[in-house]
Regions:
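Residues at the start of alpha-helices and the adjacent loop-to-helix junctions
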Residues: 2-3, 14, 147
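Bacterial N-terminal signal peptides
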Residues: 9-19
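Central antiparallel beta-sheet cores of small beta-barrel/beta-sandwich binding domains
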Residues: 51-54, 60, 64-175
Length: 175
């Protein structure tokens, strides 16, 4: 009985099974053409002008609070995350890519308000705040690169012999 069943199974596999493992290949037809975009395809968003990008940057950071976390980097290792908060009172363009950010900076037991001169460069439509060796009263000298995107921020910073990473969300103060 087992040999009969094995023979029938082998015959079925040989007869039908080979088609299971074969791949159907579609022969190219002369009528095959690239598909045209459908009406459902959304048109690309128009790019904002430099003036519109500056206005958006200013609106994002005026009367804004950046709340998030930072961690130190020591010997290539990330430290524990700690909370921080930056309150931006106002942002003004000085000229070219130089801006003045009036900020209240709170971290640890420190709470200071200071005008911070920064450069603002762009990665496409995304502003990147650049701070190079800027003295913060009562705190030291810092350098940083902070990207602003869709009401979030992320960046890296150094201060003397230490540095770290930072990230969080941006919220507008209600009037």
């Amino acid at each position: 009985m087992n040999s009969t069943l094995a023979s029938i199974t082998s015959a079925l596999v040989l007869t039908f099974g080979m088609n299971v493992f074969a791949q159907d290949t579609k022969k190219p037809e002369a009528t095959d053409k690239p598909k045209e975009p459908t009406a459902k395809t959304s048109p690309a968003k128009p790019k904002l002008t430099p003036e519109e990008l500056e206005a958006k940057f200013k609106a994002t950071l005026t009367k804004a609070t950046l709340s998030g976390r930072w961690c130190s980097i020591k010997e290539g290792q990330l430290g524990l995350e700690k909370e921080d908060k930056y309150t931006i009172i106002g942002v003004n363009k000085v000229g070219g890519d130089v801006w003045m950010i009036n900020a209240r900076i709170q971290y640890g037991k420190k709470d200071i308000t200071a005008p911070i001169p920064v450069q603002v460069k762009r990665a496409g439509d995304t502003p990147v705040i650049i701070v190079d060796d800027v003295g913060v009263p009562g705190s030291g000298t810092y350098s940083a690169r902070v990207m602003i995107y869709n009401n979030t921020y992320a960046g890296t910073w150094t201060g003397g012999d230490h540095g770290g990473l930072m990230n969080g969300v941006i919220t507008q103060q209600k009037e």
